[in-house]
Amino acid sequence: MAMAYLRAGLSINPLNGKVPAVPDWTKFAHQLPTTDHVSVWWHEHPTANLGIVCGPASGVFVLDQDGEQGPQSLLLRELPPTVKTGSGRHYYFALPSDTQFKNAVGFLPGLDLRTTGGQVVVPPSRHASGAKYVWDILPEQLARALADIDIPYEGEIQPFAEAPDWLLEEIANLAK
């Protein structure tokens, strides 16, 4: 499964739960790991969860919604839900090439921003609660790479969404 994510152009890393299992994983925000890296990592961590390293290499950033407050922060916002997590959702967006986003815990109530130097857990990983991570909207590039693999998803196949203006404005306010 990890190789399929890599074939899709997504920078990946093995996770112990939600914690990266390799010490130098952050460098893969700017470069994709090699197939040799991935082979060694999963040989050393055969039961690891799978994570996407956010940033330029993968071309994505993620809003990580957890708990009760997250849905309230997004109540009147239009977002493409993409992954159901054990305790919320991940909303994936194409990373604009001209931006320097920073990770932010509590970006909005119940929402964390995961970007360059951040990572998120992806299907078919399991949450500590036992719940499986499931794609709601399977990214188009991943669907092509996974054509011969059965990956759980419940909705449609689309490219990563462009971030809406309101979200880019909120992110810009972080830098002020």
Go through each PLM region and give its residues.
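Conserved phosphate/metal-binding and DNA-contacting active-site motifs used
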Residues: 1-176
